[in-house]
């Protein structure tokens, strides 16, 4: 099972040419439109546009798409199912809700699939003045995630080696899980402290104005991408209003 | 850099981490700072790096770098610590080297030429775009070194930079240090208890004493030889455990972590498992220890080992944990992974209690082990607060508490100074005399010489073209 979130350098795909802040901007455009539209047609049009972008994000085969979106698909299906079971509006509203969830989350998938985390941090600090301590600190912390996964395995095995095993008793399983989680937390804090010391020793956040070796340029195509997002939303709204299906959630 | 009567004490500790240290190092000198664990080597280095503020503890005497307080001179100081994974920030090699230059506010157009030249200087064999996650430990540490050197520090501090690496990785790092400091425009201070390896690279050797003070060793000084235990080779006893074409492949991985391996573990003998990183040494240890099921082949336990099991036909990884600890004991590379209680005494009693011993019997066993392994004074201490050497002895003791016939140890001498090394090797030799079978996974050639009857040298699996 592949994690849908990649932490290493991302192989460039066509969509990588769009600056991460432009992609975040597009999400900011799509978000309110989807949040207020309670009908099926509006999110469906937006979703269709997003699906067209999947190949540009390097997600060309059903397999790669599934690898990135399985938690999302599962979530959308769950939302729809719960709505059908417990809601009073039946199938149609369940499906509309699922499509909205997908349309809301897919831009995030596009961003993650096409964006190198380092480039994202560069763009955020240079264009949106996000504090470097936060952006690069998060980046450094993300690097530790796969290491912690390996550590979790080791701690679990080490407990069996000490004769501690829960067997089939769920209470004992819960306690062992909590114990392992605590040991992992201790390990994570220890590693994190060392990483922070190493970053301090390299002059991170020492009060000198930080430069950025890679830079982050906003080009005309970034504006075009944003305009595209606005156009898709406008078209979706226009279409659903024209056909009389538009249905704001707060009415 | 200059220290006069310098000392430091952490707020939660009674004893001084370092005291009465006088040291003067002139620009361009290359100094090795050595001494036993707990003598305050790392504390001194942190102080020089300007990482010990007034909040961290109490300081006496004077410490200056370039005539200034270390924190003010931080921009002129580069540091390399032990764990490469806790030092790399970026996902690409070049970006990581650039990190320090960016922090120093160097203009972007001057950064990349500087990165290229420092990568060449440390002999980094890959391009700037290489993913840091795909590097070996030695290459990662070379990259960390390049990152520390990139801002052209006047003082380079190395805190046991090879302690977490295999011998090949350690050689890579020492070569890189030799190349990078050859021009002598950087003052070098290395902290390491493996003095021998650094001797050719340094001009002076200074030893910190645990009781305080520092001793300068003259030219031609050599560290005391390792104390090897006297061993009487025994004929191999009955085979207890056997790997039959046992191999392991991680789920989703293309290459096996361990290629199919055959090996026998007889009573009263010590098997050393050696070989470069990535050949599956630790994986083999986990299979033999009954902690992981092999994905190919099998691990077979002899009747001598399976006697008393409820289901003796099952392989070790299917045994219940309490049955396992009475037959096969495992000591992990990092002792903290194994500690489960808040007191040394409880830690030792845990295994016996788990495997069905009564309260009295379990605590008697704990007393006896503490007495024998010199841990009695620490009975009430928290295992996590012990020194590296003490933690290691305790982790071996916890495995012995349930009296297993087979003892599997992963890198038992890792990070130990010469004194604790000697104690540990003597302890293991004793286990072997008692008729236990030992499996040692190790990079340490000295421990193989000191203890092993048989050696299994794992080879890298050829990568198909």
Predicted regions and their residues:
Chain B
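Catalytic Walker B motif of ABC-type/P-loop ATPase nucleotide-binding domains
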Residues: 156-160, 407-411
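The feature captures the beta-strand-to-loop junction immediately N-terminal to the Walker
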Residues: 34-36, 274-276
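Conserved ABC ATPase "signature" region
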Residues: 109-127, 360-378
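Conserved ABC ATPase signature
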Residues: 131-135, 139, 382-386, 390
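ABC-family nucleotide-binding domains
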Residues: 159, 166, 417
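ABC ATPase NBD Q-loop/coupling interface
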Residues: 50-52, 62-73, 298-323
């Amino acid at each position: 099972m592949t994690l849908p979130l990649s932490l290493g350098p991302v192989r460039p795909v066509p969509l990588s040419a769009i600056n991460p802040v432009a992609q975040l901007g597009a999400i900011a455009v799509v978000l309110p439109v989807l949040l207020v539209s309670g009908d099926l047609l509006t999110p469906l049009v937006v979703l269709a546009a997003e699906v067209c972008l999947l190949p540009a994000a390097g997600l060309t085969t059903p397999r790669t798409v599934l690898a990135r979106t399985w938690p999302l698909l599962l979530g959308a299906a769950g939302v729809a199912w719960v709505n059908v079971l417990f809601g009073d509006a039946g199938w149609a509203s369940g499906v509309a809700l699922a499509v909205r969830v997908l349309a809301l989350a897919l831009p995030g998938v596009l961003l993650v699939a096409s964006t190198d985390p380092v480039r994202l941090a560069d763009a955020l600090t240079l264009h949106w003045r996000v504090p470097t301590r936060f952006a690069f600190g998060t980046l450094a912390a993300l690097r530790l995630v796969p290491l912690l996964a390996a550590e979790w395995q080791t701690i679990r095995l080490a407990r069996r080696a000490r004769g501690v095993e829960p067997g089939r008793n769920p209470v004992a399983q819960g306690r062992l899980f909590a114990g392992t989680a605590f040991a992992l937390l201790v390990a994570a804090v220890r590693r994190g402290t060392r990483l922070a010391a190493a970053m301090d020793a390299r002059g991170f956040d020492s009060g000198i104005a930080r430069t950025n070796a890679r830079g982050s340029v906003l080009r005309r195509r970034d504006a075009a991408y944003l305009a595209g997002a606005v156009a898709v939303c406008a078209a979706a709204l226009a279409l659903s209003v024209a056909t009389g299906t538009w249905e704001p959630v707060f009415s | 850099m200059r220290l006069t009567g310098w000392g430091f004490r952490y707020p939660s500790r009674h004893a001084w981490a370092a005291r009465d240290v006088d040291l003067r190092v002139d620009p361009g000198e290359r100094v090795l700072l050595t001494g036993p664990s707990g003598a305050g080597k790392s504390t001194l280095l942190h102080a020089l790096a300007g990482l010990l503020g007034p909040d961290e503890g109490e300081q006496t005497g004077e410490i200056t770098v370039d005539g200034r307080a270390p924190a003010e001179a931080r921009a002129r100081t580069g540091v390399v610590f032990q764990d490469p994974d806790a030092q790399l920030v970026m996902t690409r090699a070049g970006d990581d080297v650039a990190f320090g230059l960016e922090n120093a506010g160097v203009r972007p157009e001057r950064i990349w030429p500087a990165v290229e030249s420092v990568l060449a200087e440390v002999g980094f064999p890959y391009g700037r775009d290489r993913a840091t996650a795909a590097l070996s430990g030695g290459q990662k540490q070379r990259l960390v070194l390049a990152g520390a050197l990139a801002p052209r520090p006047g003082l380079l501090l190395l805190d046991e930079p090879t302690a977490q690496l295999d011998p090949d990785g350690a050689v890579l790092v020492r070569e890189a240090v030799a190349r990078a400091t050859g021009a002598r425009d950087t003052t070098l201070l290395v902290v390491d208890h493996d003095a021998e390896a650094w001797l050719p690279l340094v001009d002076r050797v200074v030893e910190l004493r645990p009781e305080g003070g520092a001793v300068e060793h003259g030219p031609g000084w050599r560290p005391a030889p390792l104390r090897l235990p006297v061993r009487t080779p025994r004929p191999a006893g009955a085979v207890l455990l056997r790997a039959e074409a046992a191999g392991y492949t991680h789920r989703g991985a293309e290459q096996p972590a361990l290629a199919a391996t055959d090996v026998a573990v007889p009573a009263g003998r010590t098997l050393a498992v050696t070989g470069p990183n990535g050949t599956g040494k630790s994986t083999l240890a986990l299979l033999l220890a009954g902690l992981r099921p092999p994905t190919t082949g099998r691990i077979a336990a002899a009747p001598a080992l399976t006697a008393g099991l409820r289901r003796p036909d099952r392989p070790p990884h299917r045994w219940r944990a309490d049955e396992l600890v009475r037959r096969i004991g495992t000591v992990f590379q990092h002792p903290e992974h194994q500690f489960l209680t808040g007191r040394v005494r409880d830690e030792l009693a845990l295994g016996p209690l788990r495997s069905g011993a009564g309260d009295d019997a379990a605590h008697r066993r704990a007393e006896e082990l503490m007495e024998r392994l010199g841990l009695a004074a620490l009975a009430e201490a928290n295992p996590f607060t012990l020194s590296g050497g003490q933690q290691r002895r305790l982790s071996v003791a916890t495995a012995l508490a349930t009296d297993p016939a087979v003892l599997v140890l992963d890198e038992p001498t890792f990070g130990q100074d010469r004194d604790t090394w000697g104690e540990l090797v003597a302890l293991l030799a004793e286990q072997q005399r008692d008729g236990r079978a030992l499996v040692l996974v190790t990079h340490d050639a000295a421990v193989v010489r000191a203890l092993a009857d048989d050696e299994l040298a794992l080879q890298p699996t050829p990568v198909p073209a």
